[in-house]
């Protein structure tokens, strides 16, 4: 893991920068899937997560919060993911935590320049 700079992680995944590839793209990995996204794309993804929270499970579903009945749109128009309510909450945390750390790091870098 020496080739990366970790930004944030939780139970479902991790976000990081590759050391040798600059910091414009952020690698997000969760649900066995990797995304290379800009900060704006992560914000868009977070909006899609919030929209997906309005989807409900079937009333008769025996799996409850573990049922992968929520269709999560990704920043790529051609890719959607089936996730559970639990996974959706963890993805929400991963995206929010990543954005918080990026914004905090940018703030500190700008503060130290002055």
Predicted regions and their residues:
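Positively charged, low-complexity terminal tracts
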Residues: 1-114
């Amino acid at each position: 893991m020496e080739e990366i700079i970790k930004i944030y992680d939780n139970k479902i995944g991790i976000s990081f920068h590759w050391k040798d590839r600059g910091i414009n793209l952020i690698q997000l990995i969760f649900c066995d899937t990797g995304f290379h996204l800009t900060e704006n794309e992560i914000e868009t993804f977070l909006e899609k997560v919030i929209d997906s929270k309005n989807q409900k499970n079937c009333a008769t579903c025996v799996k409850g919060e573990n049922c992968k009945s929520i269709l999560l749109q990704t920043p790529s128009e051609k890719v959607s993911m089936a996730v559970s309510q639990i996974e959706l909450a963890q993805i929400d945390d991963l995206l929010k935590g990543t954005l918080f750390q990026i914004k905090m790091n940018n703030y500190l870098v700008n503060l130290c320049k002055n």
